[in-house]
Amino acid sequence: MNPLKKAYCRVFQNVFKFALPLLPYRNPKIIGSVKGITEVLEKRNYNNVLIITDAGIRSLGLTERLEQTLKRSCISYHIYDKTVANPTTVNVDEALHMYLDNDCQAIIGFGGGSSMDCAKATAARIAKPHQSLAQMKGILKIHKKLPLLIAIPTTAGTGSETTLAAVITDAETRHKYAINDFPLIPRYAVLDPKVTLSLPPFITATTGMDALTHAVEAYIGNSTTPGTRKNALDAVRLIFENLDTAYTDGNNIEARRNMLRASYFAGCAFTKSYVGYVHAIAHSLGGKYNVPHGLANAVILPMVLETYGDSITHKLRNLAVTAGLCDKHEDDKTAARMFIDAVKDMKKRFGIGDYIPEIQETDIPELAHYADKEANPLYPVPVLMDASELETLYYRLMPPAGNC
């Protein structure tokens, strides 16, 4: 990256860092069970809600407990279940019309990050009906109170139940972009491990590594606070202690509960301290090829950590100690290597490879352009890279010839 752009990025990031204490961040209030939702709705005299989820979640019967809970309290509900893996502007438009046509009063995002992103974006369109989502992309462009938004994560990974972001894909261009503003933070997050028990092992693994990526990128960035560092470390500890158990024994409710806590802590960490190039690259791949976000993060994370090199060895040492990989007396370089190797070993145990076979060489300049545009100047990464430097990372993610 040229010196002028680098200086601009760092000034921009420092302004946001020093503004952190003045910004209206808030954490969602935690509800420990789906059954607790009715009390929240009844206090507001709400009796008609929209549930935004996806067909897979619905077919597994995961929404049934919520539906029965609402029925017992005489609360009407309507379900939008067409959300796709990388939610599109079409999904949001359809959910918006369902909300308005049925005079709903609140939105419940039920599912993984995609359902919650769709729910957030739908709420934004309700608050600003005369603006398109494209006009809201970027930072602090909503400025309005949203309908009551409740998030029920069925995966322990995205952290979307805590964040001020909604990531949406333009249905026509396939460009994936983020909308970031404080009203998008859900008012309530329901951390109910019972809704995660049916999650298949591979999705448990990829979403768990998504949470790990959130925590790691938040921790190694340049805009941390004591609070975000603590949240990130707590998330890393819980993930290393519980993800393997949740993967091999999906009915272990304590492991599931701890993974939900890890995802929540990681979400709180990166909401204030941001993510980095792992996410920027993963978003470009999700938008272009529908590569699942957690899977992309798991593949990309160790490569980017190695690319940052010596700039993050001390921070990776702290993560290695927290993960139980070494004691505090280990030297920085050795401990950093231990942490990166542990991430590689983890994804290998879960059957996650080293490459993204969907990448087409002719697409790389476009992909790198989108990653550069997303990350710079916003993300306070340890080492700045421009589009041309990011291109080299995409090439490294392509399978070697004859190994597709």
Question: Residue spans of the language-model regions?
Answer:
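Glycine/threonine-rich beta-strand-loop-alpha-helix active-site module
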Residues: 90-194
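C-terminal catalytic subdomain
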Residues: 273-338, 344
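C-terminal charged capping/lid subdomain of soluble metabolic enzymes
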Residues: 2-8, 316, 326-404
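An N-terminal, well-structured beta->alpha segment
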Residues: 1-79, 400-404
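Carboxylate- and glycine-rich phosphate/diphosphate-binding segment that chelates Mg2+/Mn2+
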Residues: 165-273
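N-terminal small/polar loop signature for handling phosphorylated ligands or for N-terminal nucleophile
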Residues: 50, 58-130, 245-256
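Flexible, glycine/charged-enriched surface loops at secondary-structure junctions
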Residues: 222-231, 246-258, 273-278, 330-336, ...
